[in-house]
UniProtKB/Swiss-Prot annotation:
Enzyme Commission identifier(s): 1.14.13.148, 1.14.13.32, 1.14.13.8
Protein name: Flavin-containing monooxygenase 3
UniProt GO molecular function: albendazole monooxygenase activity; flavin adenine dinucleotide binding; hypotaurine monooxygenase activity; N,N-dimethylaniline monooxygenase activity; NADP binding; trimethylamine monooxygenase activity
Key word Iron present: no
Keywords: Endoplasmic reticulum, FAD, Flavoprotein, Membrane, Microsome, Monooxygenase, NADP, Oxidoreductase, Phosphoprotein, Transmembrane, Transmembrane helix
Leading EC class: oxidoreductase
Recorded name of the encoding gene: Fmo3
Binding site for FAD: 9-13, 32, 40-41, 61-62
Family note: Belongs to the FMO family.
Natural source organism: Mus musculus (Mouse)
SUPFAM superfamilies documented for this protein: FAD/NAD(P)-binding domain
Other information: Trimethylamine is a bacterial metabolite found in some animal odors, and is a repulsive odor associated with bad breath and spoiled food for most organisms, except for M.musculus, where it acts as an attractant.
Length: 534
């Protein structure tokens, strides 16, 4: 008899989970509280309780070749960085193409998930849902939590003395939709993340004055990188990851800081992070530096206190006559339908083995998909997480002992502290993490074998973008089109921009080899510098 799996949420994580269950011969039932797939990317012009929310102008920060489902490339004419409506179109197309919609119960929120009385022997769960006021409970052999982590706003009001006296409007960035109503107003944005920078840059075109308050600063990256290519196709390579993790720390830190300052010197703009060498996820914004340069956005330190109409910053300066304060301060991790101790089993921190499995459960029949942050895209991560989880639920893969899993969590937390500091417990190193998950299911590319068998492909896999197709080259669920997708990914990235015929200066292959030479030159120079210094 097929094992029944309850999947909560029909965003990209939920769709990956449904598909993975079907690939492993499991029987999925997905519960989605809204009336459509897409999750975070399904735009609504109003705020819906219990659902993620985005603003009208949102574009992706990952490019199309790096954020697709591994066996389902985007159409050639799709732009590299998409408006949310184009991504929603792709997600819907994927769900239809893979015949996933029939496994989804829409407008059916999950109200509770509880262990069955005999959980210690069966690992089964009681899942209670509610539709049109009617509650139903069903028993499942396993559950996959795919409801995301952009639902419950984190607004640290206690950290801002006097905020209760402030007479202007005050709300979280989750409630922001479009800039028109703030025309001619004075706006303070608290937080220097992606949402805060997007909102501030957009508001600066209509507001009288926009100020961003940041406690610790941030690196601000452009989506456009070397030679005008998408940043992630140039930066997220196995070669660069190898250098980052194996060069001496001093050289690695110097190289990282140099990369971050390649576009502009952050110190001059008041943006430089307090700790410049931490690998916290940078902000992606192509417009913010220009808005600062034009005087339309001002960067300030943390707010010391509020008055009725103003904000006093820690440097003693003030922003007066404020009409609105927008808290772009992130989200909390919460699953109200689930016992909180399952996900946060220690010190109120997310405690999951490899970011997926609660280690303390008697049976490994619950998986959390998509509860990670990374410099890489979410879709390929959720695909690998779901494939691994489905194999564990089926019994094809097994997990280590509880002690071994907890030891691994402790080790990973130490590594995260080194690279990302103490503020981001769910951030991870993209390629290292993807390879780790892929190795569990036999989907990790064998580079040595590739260099012997298919040198052309091997060079692109190692030196080129670590695109999702790499994880469907081998193993269960391998895709026959993966090799061609990898070898033609640069062409697809250029296709939507070639709307005017120009004379060719050089062929794409010469571009590849020139890029390869530049990449090889950097570590040679760094190693030479290191040898001179010692």
């Amino acid at each position: 008899m097929k094992k029944k799996v309850a999947i909560i949420g029909a965003g990209v994580s939920g769709l990956a989970a449904i598909r993975s269950c079907l690939e492993e011969g499991l029987e999925p039932t997905c519960f989605e509280r809204s009336d459509d797939v897409g999750g975070l990317w399904k735009f609504s012009d109003h705020i819906e309780e219990g659902r993620a929310s985005i603003y009208q102008s949102v574009f992706t920060n990952s490019s199309k070749e790096m954020m697709c489902f591994p066996d389902f490339p985007y159409p050639d004419d799709f732009p590299n960085f998409m408006h949310h409506s184009k991504l929603q179109e792709y997600i819907t197309s994927f769900a239809k193409e893979k015949n996933l919609l029939k496994y989804i119960q829409f407008e059916t929120p999950v109200t509770s998930i509880n262990k069955c009385p005999n959980f210690s022997t069966t690992g089964k769960w009681e899942v209670t849902t509610e539709k049109h006021g009617k509650k139903e409970t069903a028993v499942f052999d396993a559950t996959m939590i795919c409801s995301g982590h952009h639902i419950f706003p984190h607004v640290p009001k206690d950290s801002f003395p006097g905020l209760n006296r402030f007479k202007g409007k005050c709300f979280h960035s989750r409630d922001y939709k479009e800039p028109g109503i703030w025309k001619g107003k004075r706006v303070l944005v608290i937080g220097l993340g992606n949402s805060g920078c997007d909102i501030a840059a957009e508001l600066s075109h209509v507001a009288q004055k926009v100020t961003i308050s940041s406690r610790s600063g941030s690196w601000v990256m452009s989506r456009v990188w070397d030679d005008g290519y998408p940043w992630d196709m140039v930066v997220l390579t196995r070669f660069q990851t190898f250098l980052k993790n194996n060069l001496p720390t001093a050289i690695s830190d110097w190289w990282y800081t140099r990369q971050m300052n390649a576009r502009f010197k952050h110190e001059n703009y008041g943006l430089v992070p307090l700790n410049r060498t931490l690998r916290k996820e940078p902000v992606f914004n192509d417009e913010l530096p220009a808005r600062i340069l034009c005087g339309m956005v001002t960067i300030k330190p943390n707010v010391k206190e509020f008055t009725e109409t103003s904000a006093v910053f820690e440097d003693g300066t003030m922003f007066e006559a404020i009409d609105c304060v927008i808290f772009a301060t992130g989200y909390g991790y919460a699953y109200p339908f689930l016992d909180d101790s399952i996900i946060k089993s220690r010190n109120n921190e997310v405690t999951l083995y490899k970011g997926v499995f609660p280690p303390q459960l008697e049976k490994p029949t619950m998986a959390v998909i998509g509860l990670v942050q990374s410099l890489g895209a979410t879709i390929p991560i959720t695909d690998l997480q779901a494939r691994w989880a489905a194999q564990v639920i089926k019994g094809t893969c097994t997990l280590p002992s509880v002690n071994d899993m907890m030891d691994d969590i402790d080790e990973k937390m130490g590594e995260k502290f080194k690279w990302y500091g103490n503020s981001t417990t769910i951030q991870t190193d993209y390629i290292v993490y993807m390879d780790e998950l892929a190795s569990f299911i036999g989907a990790k590319p064998n580079l040595l074998w590739l260099f012997l068998k298919d040198p052309r492909l091997a060079v692109e896999v190692f030196f080129g973008p670590c695109s999702p197709y790499q994880f469907r080259l081998v193993g269960p669920g391998k895709w026959s089109g993966a090799r061609n997708a990898i070898l033609t990914q640069w062409d697809r990235s250029l296709k939507p921009m070639k709307t005017r015929v120009v004379s060719k200066v050089q062929k794409s292959c010469s571009h590849f080899y020139s890029r390869l030479l530049r990449l090889l030159a950097v570590p040679v120079l760094l190693i030479a510098l290191f040898l001179v210094l010692i």
